[in-house]
Amino acid sequence: MAKHLFTSESVSEGHPDKIADQISDAVLDAILQQDPKARVACETYVKTGMVLVGGEITTSAWVDIEEITRNTVREIGYVHSDMGFDANSCAVLSAIGKQSPDINQGVDRADPLEQGAGDQGLMFGYATNETDVLMPAPITYAHRLVQRQAEVRKNGTLPWLRPDAKSQVTFQYDDGKIVGIDAVVLSTQHAEDIDQKSLQEAVMEEIIKPILPSEWLNTSTKFFINPTGRFVIGGPMGDCGLTGRKIIVDTYGGMARHGGGAFSGKDPSKVDRSAAYAARYVAKNIVAAGLADRCEIQVSYAIGVAEPTSIMVETFGTEKVPVEQLILLVREFFDLRPYGLIQMLDLLHPIYKETAAYGHFGRENFPWEKTDKAQLLRDAAGLK
């Protein structure tokens, strides 16, 4: 491959869509804590002065949705009306129903191993050896920039920052290898009383420089810091937010394909979420094993059926063993039936709120990021 540019973006925990994702996953976690077998599909909508939590939930648990919502918004940092959104005074509306019994009869089984998929669909997982976390560099560094924005906002280093922010990083590649960063965009909500010059200098020194490796920056790297010149009105006052609207930010930043299903607010019986996590786990272990430099996995399901309807392995010509052998290894070492992957990745725990900002992949504390099968795969493939 010749020289090319590739761009990925991320958004902060205070972005309206991410507020919605975090509320949905906070509700899910609270329910799973009491009832690991709950069926949860929780959607959230946020706008100036209000939060609407809706969806289908079947559970023996009781949770205080209003309290969970306010606590989540408070932790993000919207605690005063001058930010356009206030955890203490916003209205919280609830519109929760039960999961359809027509779905239940296809999912629930006497033998757990025969648990059917909660819906049809296709899911992708991806890994690449271009970063230490086996993720694409553009999305990895886009996430780290907005994570740093939240860090210096919350620890008081830059107290005039506000919760809403977006980042975008364009990497230069030559023959598939990173040779530099071409452009960086960082837009952050701020208080009224900070001037543009001071903001740009502080963002460069406290957010961008500590995060982006200096060897990838050069005199031709372009920086766009709050390029409109003003970003006081942000969060739900600037835009409404909705669960599941940042699916590329949540995954691979456009470097890999996406099946279209969002993650947040869904319990692990929903293969949109759990099978996408499992596909990442498979791809990451293949790359960690040295069986390919890049790997994309596709799995698909039929509602009510346990076995995947298809498994695909794509290695973009970087495989060290035949792709046909990789597919056999995947089938041998990974149980991709809904119940099997839930057990394999230990998913029936309240671990989801943390996934809802800064990406679901490339963060080592999540079980689907383990590389515990890499050596097994390498040995089975006959590589020394």
Curated annotation (Swiss-Prot):
CDD domains to which the protein is assigned, alphabetical: S-AdoMet_synt (cd18079)
Q: Which GO terms describe its cellular component?
A: cytoplasm
Q: Which residues bind ATP?
A: 15, 164-166, 230-231, 239, 245-246, 262, 266
Domain of life (superkingdom) = Bacteria
Keyword Metal-binding set for record: yes
Question: Per UniProt, where does Mg(2+) bind?
Answer: 17
Q: What is its main location?
A: cytoplasm
Q: Where is this region: Flexible loop?
A: 99-109
Q: How is the cofactor bound?
A: Binds 2 divalent ions per subunit.
Instruction: Name the positions where K(+) binds.
Output: 43
Q: In which pathway does it act?
A: Amino-acid biosynthesis; S-adenosyl-L-methionine biosynthesis; S-adenosyl-L-methionine from L-methionine: step 1/1
Which reaction(s) does its UniProt entry say it catalyses? L-methionine + ATP + H2O = S-adenosyl-L-methionine + phosphate + diphosphate
Q: What is its EC number?
A: 2.5.1.6
- Cofactor(s) required for function per UniProt: Mg(2+); K(+)
Describe its function: Catalyzes the formation of S-adenosylmethionine (AdoMet) from methionine and ATP. The overall synthetic reaction is composed of two sequential steps, AdoMet formation and the subsequent tripolyphosphate hydrolysis which occurs prior to release of AdoMet from the enzyme.
State how it assembles: Homotetramer; dimer of dimers.
| HAMAP family referenced in this protein's UniProt entry, alphabetically | S_AdoMet_synth1 (MF_00086)
What name does UniProt use for this protein?
S-adenosylmethionine synthase
Q: Which organism is it from?
A: Salmonella heidelberg (strain SL476)
Lineage summary = Bacteria, Pseudomonadati, Pseudomonadota, Gammaproteobacteria, Enterobacterales
Name of the gene: metK
